[in-house]
Design a protein with these regions (language model features):
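Glycine-rich active-site loops that engage anionic ligands at enzyme catalytic sites
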Residues: 2-235
Length: 235
């Protein structure tokens, strides 16, 4: 159920980029997706998430979960009704502005192709590139962690060169290993633990992205940047 759209907003200010809808009985999903990933919109979401850490900003707030182009807000509906909560969230979004995060920088060594990069050849075929070109492009850019999700410590990485964009697999794999380096659409990632996946596996890295005994348990955070460095080249 959509609570807020630009034409329905009761605020004096109207932001045509946002939609707020119910998510269960105690959640609101603020969605700003409007096509390709927009870094400025994502930075506004980060800023809004930081604002919501102030308990005075949103009565009854329980938890926030930042996503790619969206933000899930969990609240106590006994303290604030859904319509009022949506209005507060809309007003806070309107007053937010893009705020870059000074994140950490990581360099991840990886091996492309082989048994643990079984989709490298497929990606090359689909993009019309050689395998060496795929490796060169994938390792030539700096990726930004837009959000964590899907599984504990799983980073949604933006910055994949457009030439490497391929649709997700039609049939997902039920299990791929920890450390699998994957791409799909305009995003990339590296698996923090074994799990199912519908993305294309192009390589493998020694990557410890999640430790339940650590604080914080996830190695990466939104705003962090990373580069993939080829550990071994194809011969």
């Amino acid at each position: 159920m959509i609570l807020f759209e630009p034409t329905l907003a009761t605020s004096k200010a109207v932001d045509t980029s946002v939609r707020i809808s119910l998510s269960g009985t105690d959640g609101l999903l603020l969605d700003v997706s409007c096509g390709p990933f927009d870094k400025a919109l994502q930075q506004r979401l980060w800023a809004l998430n930081n604002t919501l850490r102030d308990p005075q900003s949103f009565p009854g707030l329980v938890e926030t979960v930042p996503g790619v182009n969206n933000l899930l807000v969990i609240y106590d509906p006994r303290k604030i009704p859904p319509d009022a909560a949506a209005q507060v969230l809309s007003d806070l979004w309107i007053s937010s502005s893009p705020t870059p995060i000074n994140g950490k920088r990581f360099v991840i060594d990886m091996i492309y192709g082989g048994e643990r990069g079984m989709d490298l050849d497929y990606v090359a075929e689909q993009t019309g590139l050689t395998q060496r070109d795929v490796i060169a492009l994938h390792s030539s850019v700096t990726y930004t962690v837009a959000a964590l999700g899907s599984m504990p410590g799983f980073p949604y990485l933006v910055g994949l060169p457009p030439a490497l964009e391929v649709p997700r697999r039609q049939v997902p794999r039920t299990l791929i290993p920890k450390g699998s380096v994957v791409i799909a659409g305009e995003q990339a990632s590296v698996f923090p633990c074994p799990g199912p996946c519908g993305w294309h596996v192009i390589g493998h890295a020694d990557f410890d992205g999640f430790d339940s005994q650590a604080m914080p348990p996830a190695l990466l955070s939104p705003g962090d940047t990373l580069v993939f460095r080829p550990k071994a080249q194809l011969k």
